[in-house]
Amino acid sequence: MSLEIVILAAGQGTRMRSALPKVLHPIAGKPMLGHVIDCARQLQPERIHVVIGHGADLVRERMAADDLNFVLQAEQLGTGHAVAQALPFLSADQVLILYGDVPLIQLDTLQRLLAQVTPDQLSLLTVDMLDPTGYGRIVRDDQGAVQAIVEHKDATPAQRQIGEINTGILAVPGKRLADWLGRLSNDNAQGEYYLTDVIAMAVGDGLVVASAQPLDAMEVQGVNDRMQQAQLERHYQRLRAEELMRQGVTLLDPQRLDVRGEISVGRDVLIDVNVVLEGRVVIEDDVRIGPNCVIRDSVLRRGAVIKANSHLEGAELGEGSDAGPFARLRPGSVLGARAHVGNFVELKNARLGEGSKAGHLSYLGDAELGANCNIGAGTITCNYDGANKFRTELGDDVFIGSNNSLVAPLKIGDGATTAAGSTITHEVPAKNLAFGRARQKNLENWKRPEKIKK
């Protein structure tokens, strides 16, 4: 059967106390709405319709994609009214209704829900709660069949004792939806058009109302304030940490890892505390990551080591290479096999060949280094003239003395050496020694200045 999905994302989120629309607040670095859309896409629907209201332009701008149809709900008059805004665009056999502020919903749960939908049967997602205050209750008959959903404010004292609640997630036969929505009334305590009233209508029309429950109740936890957002963030991170450990990663403290992207890991990886992984990160076998590191959109080849307090973005570390502590590798940085970048070294768009080393206190930008080069402490590539960037190219086996300024554009040949304290402005041929400093002079019997007596 064909499927279309409606995601309700029009709410203001007053309790978030933010100018940002609630559904754009992040979980693991991605807008909550983005998590819901990603899950919805895995169901391969004909179309995904996103109902927007508060902050509509910003939501549309941030989440724009070819497979999304944004539908405006100018006035927020309830969930039933919100779904009705998408009716002109719906033609599928099944319609699944999701929520942009319920970001942890899982594919397996939705598949089980949809499997129960037929032309004469709809299915809703429920969950049992110890404290169901504020939620709509699932009312069943003596045989256990769902009869209705009663919102908390409209519930009788007896109905408020019910622990099974409505999550709001619902899958219905598409051809029935327009009729039900057209019959909704706002004659209730909230003065809104409740989507949940569809359940009683379906029962009255002789349809069966099936139900399913998620394996983890946190899947259907919504976000209304910053505390709930933080709860879901930690729960999500716990799930990601457990997933990594099942794949053979040792986490010294699973509660002190943040994963904010798509991570691929090998076996026997060790990750210390307070590590943040963002974007697309590939970590091969036997990699070691020290504490307090941030790694974004990077590739760590087999046996690479990242030492404490290092920051990598758009970088690649070759097999057996290492960086840190306190190293910064910016986009375009590549370390060859067994290359080494030490403390307080910054690379930007720089490649170090196999076995090359920059041990400490250096900046290498827009540079290409061959194999087995040694960069002395305090060396910088002067790559910017205030208007344009220029490259520095070193051959194999180059030795750069300490405290060198390499003024680009510059080429230094294989096996060349530069003296400590040099400013190198011209090409250095292979196997040459280059001095780029003033000759030392010693003044005999020099007397230091004395303070003037006042």
Swiss-Prot record:
Chain spans, region Pyrophosphorylase: 1-226
Keyword set includes Acyltransferase: yes
GO BP annotations, alphabetical order: cell morphogenesis; cell wall organization; lipid A biosynthetic process; peptidoglycan biosynthetic process; regulation of cell shape; UDP-N-acetylglucosamine biosynthetic process
Taxonomy, superkingdom: Bacteria
Residues the entry annotates as binding UDP-N-acetyl-alpha-D-glucosamine: 8-11, 22, 73, 78-79, 99-101, 136, 151, 166, 224, 330, 348, 363, 374
GO-annotated cellular components: cytoplasm; membrane
UniProt region (N-acetyltransferase), positions on chain: 248-454
Location of the region described as Linker in the Swiss-Prot/TrEMBL record: 227-247
Annotated positions binding acetyl-CoA: A377, N383, Y384, S402, A420, R437
Annotated Pfam families: Hexapep (PF00132), NTP_transf_3 (PF12804)
Keyword Glycoprotein tagged: no
Residues that bind Mg(2+): D101, N224
Gene3D superfamilies: Hexapeptide repeat proteins (2.160.10.10), Spore Coat Polysaccharide Biosynthesis Protein SpsA, Chain A (3.90.550.10)
The EC number(s) this enzyme carries: 2.7.7.23, 2.3.1.157
Pathway(s) where this gene product acts: Nucleotide-sugar biosynthesis; UDP-N-acetyl-alpha-D-glucosamine biosynthesis; N-acetyl-alpha-D-glucosamine 1-phosphate from alpha-D-glucosamine 6-phosphate (route II): step 2/2; Nucleotide-sugar biosynthesis; UDP-N-acetyl-alpha-D-glucosamine biosynthesis; UDP-N-acetyl-alpha-D-glucosamine from N-acetyl-alpha-D-glucosamine 1-phosphate: step 1/1; Bacterial outer membrane biogenesis; LPS lipid A biosynthesis
Predominant location category: cytoplasm
GO MF annotation terms: glucosamine-1-phosphate N-acetyltransferase activity; magnesium ion binding; UDP-N-acetylglucosamine diphosphorylase activity
CC cofactor note: Binds 1 Mg(2+) ion per subunit.
Subcellular location: Cytoplasm
Active site as annotated: H360 (proton acceptor)
Catalyzed chemical reaction(s): alpha-D-glucosamine 1-phosphate + acetyl-CoA = N-acetyl-alpha-D-glucosamine 1-phosphate + CoA + H(+); N-acetyl-alpha-D-glucosamine 1-phosphate + UTP + H(+) = UDP-N-acetyl-alpha-D-glucosamine + diphosphate
Annotated function: Catalyzes the last two sequential reactions in the de novo biosynthetic pathway for UDP-N-acetylglucosamine (UDP-GlcNAc). The C-terminal domain catalyzes the transfer of acetyl group from acetyl coenzyme A to glucosamine-1-phosphate (GlcN-1-P) to produce N-acetylglucosamine-1-phosphate (GlcNAc-1-P), which is converted into UDP-GlcNAc by the transfer of uridine 5-monophosphate (from uridine 5-triphosphate), a reaction catalyzed by the N-terminal domain.
Subunit-structure text: Homotrimer.
Similarity comment text for this entry: In the N-terminal section; belongs to the N-acetylglucosamine-1-phosphate uridyltransferase family. In the C-terminal section; belongs to the transferase hexapeptide repeat family.
NCBIfam families according to UniProt: glmU
Protein's name in the database: Bifunctional protein GlmU
Originating species: Pseudomonas aeruginosa (strain ATCC 15692 / DSM 22644 / CIP 104116 / JCM 14847 / LMG 12228 / 1C / PRS 101 / PAO1)
Encoding gene (name): glmU
